[in-house]
Amino acid sequence: MHQIYSATSTDKKLPEVVDLFSGCGGLALGFQLAGFNIRKGIELDRDASDVASFNLHWRQGKHDRHLNNDITLLSANEFYNDLDRKNDLIVIGGPPCQAYSKIGRAKLKSLGEERRQENDARGKLYENFLDYALHVDANVIVMENVPEAVNYGGVNIPDTVCDILINKGYDAIWTVLNAADFGVPQTRVRLFVMAIKKDIGKIKFIPEPTHKPHINVKRQSVNVRWMQSEIRNSKYYKQPNIPDETLSDWVTVGDAIGDLPNLFPVYNQKYKNYKPMMMKEYKSPPQNTFQKLMRINNKVDKVTGNMFRNTKRDFSIFDKMEEGDNYLDAHNIAMSLLRKEMRKSGITKENEFEYRLLKDRIVPPYSTEKFVEKWRKLSSDKPSHTLVAHLSTDTYSHLHPREPRGISVREAARLQSFPDDFLFDCSMGAAFKQIGNAVPPLLAKAIAEAMKKNIQGGCI
């Protein structure tokens, strides 16, 4: 078995890693698993910085931490003042993507001019990232973002970043990768800028896929149509490696979460409010390679992160939804349940007050025209669609394929390839936000291994 999560000793010959805009540490975890030492980081969100500090530093007996601070207010000199400048550094990070993403732009546009100005400011956080990276003359730089960054108000952000880095003595490229190609049970497409100082090497190597789409899954191309002109006109874009036909199939939702505890098998049972660190026994021993990888460092037969949302009105709807169903299907089910209850109680539409009360109790209020994809029941035999930070508000977008509920925190973590010993000791909303924003560790590890080859000239 390819033990991706086996304990990897830190290679002291490799540069140390500084993690900017770290979130809960998914990108840094991938580098740590590839043998890099995570020296420190910075993150604005307090819950996320605490989770990163615990999992990447403290639990291993280190005194390092991920600072909770605003990178726009803390100078690079202050941030680096406790580092030995003799040590070579890799600077990694993902400046917040809401300014670039279609979902984020639409949301902020609806909130008025003040938030649009905030959006503009967030769109330039890559400049703070570069300031921090160049301040220490980093040997290697890796920046993650959403593909929409190729056209932010007519500006190709990854091309702009590469221009700056090349003028500062780096070899730089950008590429777009699908996390599913690297063993993540999710078709998450993200953009990466990869750079190395020219006196050290060149970007000859980019991540090699470990998995391929299986026949029943339509490939979510990393070169989506709307990006073609930006790709064609870019000096720095590098085509991702194509998965070999001999590779294992993409990891599916069923592969990913099938051994996790049963939490709510019957829709009318009593809801249980699990605490973040409350442990529950696995449903079964690990059934496949992915499950073994997730559990490899978990020394007990129990797992944390079993919280899921108490959406009492909707449990009966979830129960009747089929795998792959969306909100239109859910609304039709709800209306059927409403008609059944009307017959049972003798209420008709003429009883307007009683009818309205009953409908509000059973039928979700969302438009079937605007919110068709607001609800989606996951399919066991396919990878998940992209997890997003909106999970912190609700989990309708990712409903459990076999149980009548939204996914749990641990199930979301599995779909992002966080191992079971990576702990989210925070509120449910905070955990979902961190997981939805994170770089999947397995994808991050593939990037780290490619950068290691670039540093070492192809010899690992």
Curated annotation (Swiss-Prot):
Pfam families: DNA_methylase (PF00145). Keywords: DNA-binding, Methyltransferase, Restriction system, S-adenosyl-L-methionine, Transferase. PROSITE patterns: C5_MTASE_2, SAM_MT_C5. It catalyses: a 2'-deoxycytidine in DNA + S-adenosyl-L-methionine = a 5-methyl-2'-deoxycytidine in DNA + S-adenosyl-L-homocysteine + H(+). The active site is at residue 97. Residues 15-458 form the SAM-dependent MTase C5-type domain. One of its GO terms (molecular function) is DNA (cytosine-5-)-methyltransferase activity. GO terms for biological process: DNA restriction-modification system; methylation; negative regulation of gene expression via chromosomal CpG island methylation. Its EC number is 2.1.1.37. A methylase, recognizes the double-stranded sequence 5'-ACCGGT-3', methylates C-? on both strands. No endonuclease has been identified for this methylase. Belongs to the class I-like SAM-binding methyltransferase superfamily. C5-methyltransferase family. This is Putative type II methyltransferase M.OihORF3336P. The lineage of its organism: Bacteria, Bacillati, Bacillota, Bacilli, Bacillales.
